[in-house]
A protein has these predicted regions:
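Glycine-rich, mobile lid/loop segments that gate access to catalytic sites or pores
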Residues: 1-51
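Condensing-enzyme catalytic core mediating Claisen C-C bond formation in acyl metabolism
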Residues: 11-16, 47-114, 162-175
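Acyl-CoA/ACP chain-elongation machinery
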Residues: 17-31, 92-98, 136-141
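Secondary-structure transition/capping motifs at alpha-helix termini
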Residues: 75-77, 119-124, 151
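Short glycine-rich phosphate-binding loop at a beta-alpha junction
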Residues: 128-133
């Protein structure tokens, strides 16, 4: 549906998959190491469901992350520079109902607007240093670029193709 609405070329997802694997290859602890992956390799991987190919999906895995959250007084005593939480928001919506917007879910747009307002963010592309966005399938990247306000509707794929989300290409919003 995203491809139809945005007129995005079929190889956007392939480019995301290659970029994500190359990013992972820079981390020696990443469980998937494919430093020599190519666009052709992704394009030749078997089709899961059109247009998603096997190498355009994330591998099944379990992971964990931990954060130490403290009051300002304790954070000031930390030997390392703290990262400040300026806003917190959460939204959810049923995954299936008639008329649900699947390309840009309302819950995502509302949640982003809420947390940006709390944190005083007016331009997420310029105001944020990092975003940890779950992209289980390659086509989610351009969709979430739009849904979270990094790009206007129908133009997230252009940021991907320009290299804006690539560390290797010097992108300004590397995911």
């Amino acid at each position: 549906e995203y491809m139809r609405r945005s007129k995005a070329p079929y190889d956007v997802g392939i480019k995301v998959a290659v970029k994500d694997r190359l990013h992972g290859a820079r981390n020696p602890l990443a469980h998937l190491q494919k430093p020599d992956i190519t666009m052709k390799e992704v394009e030749d991987s078997f089709m899961l469901w059109d247009p998603i190919r096997f190498l355009e999906s994330c591998p099944s895995s379990d992971g964990a992350c931990a954060m130490v959250i403290a009051c300002e007084e304790l954070a000031d005593k930390s030997p390392k520079k703290p990262a400040w939480i300026r806003g917190v928001a959460m939204r959810s919506e049923p995954t299936m109902y008639a008329g649900r917007e699947e390309v840009s879910p309302q819950a995502g747009r509302d949640c982003a607007a809420d947390v940006y307002q709390q944190a005083g963010i007016t331009d997420p592309r310029k105001d944020l240093d990092v975003a940890e966005v779950y992209v289980p399938f390659s086509w989610y990247e351009p969709m979430w670029l739009e849904n979270l306000g990094f790009a206007p509707a129908g133009e997230g794929w252009k940021l991907t193709m320009e290299g804006a989300t690539s560390l290797i290409d010097g992108g300004d919003i590397p995911w």
